[in-house]
């Protein structure tokens, strides 16, 4: 049994090493994506104009008036003092061709007091420019910038499958790390003084053992992040009833016209606080996303600046029918079945935000360890492969010499 597990561990590890090395390093960085992005791009994120911010709806109107081919798809409903108002936008459809207009940006930062633009960018663009660096790393972490063809997002599927292989390999690795109970101490030790191959081996084995629990959590949540709908939700639904995913709800009826979308946006923002109170949500309305093509708007409930959710299970969201205002779906942290709460926990666990600052630090360390395990695993394989080839070469050389001697006689 053990020889078979060793072979499986070897080939699973080699097959996923490059992907996990990349995911580990990028994950260690993007655990701090908002802070690093703001540090690299102060003009995009900071605003110095004193005064009372304009209402979010007014800022959205000004942006869409300035860029008539763009529609705001997400906007904060309030901003922190000294910060810009940053909106996500998407291209409108050309009424003549029914094709989207070409836009070279999808994110815009405005001074919330004056409404003046402070910057724009294509979030997720494959670029190492300072303005694009952190979003680039984020996209690289989740999609590898692989293409989407025939409706299949190959990057998401690749990382999801890598996560499943990694999860299985994690259980194989822990079995191999403890061959017997008597030698358990060796599986936790690092032979630092010996260095060389001994230390490389211990970094791989013992490093994985010490953080095994965190590694399993990251592996499971990586599957959820990529293949939640295709794999995780069907599996979880076997054990627990799941409410429909609120972020995949589509309202009945045709796509909203621009006028209908604007009117619905204004109505839902006006009613958001009351709807939140009726649902027992204590946080204020903090953000609005709209999908005119699917006929829904969603309101997130959080304090200004906490759109990414700093702790716990994240923020509450209500998804409404844009035409009627009816609540079609909800995600309220801690509510629902055991399966619903499990699904709510996936991103907070994967990002470490479930435990606040300590959790994010732990995730950064785990990302570096994942990269280290990938490198040391390949180094161990190379050394053993060379060791296996050496006797074979010696035997071949001896056979060649013997053949020559027989030929000479």
List each language-model region with its residue ranges.
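Conserved histidines in hydrophobic membrane contexts and catalytic metal-binding motifs
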Residues: 1-409
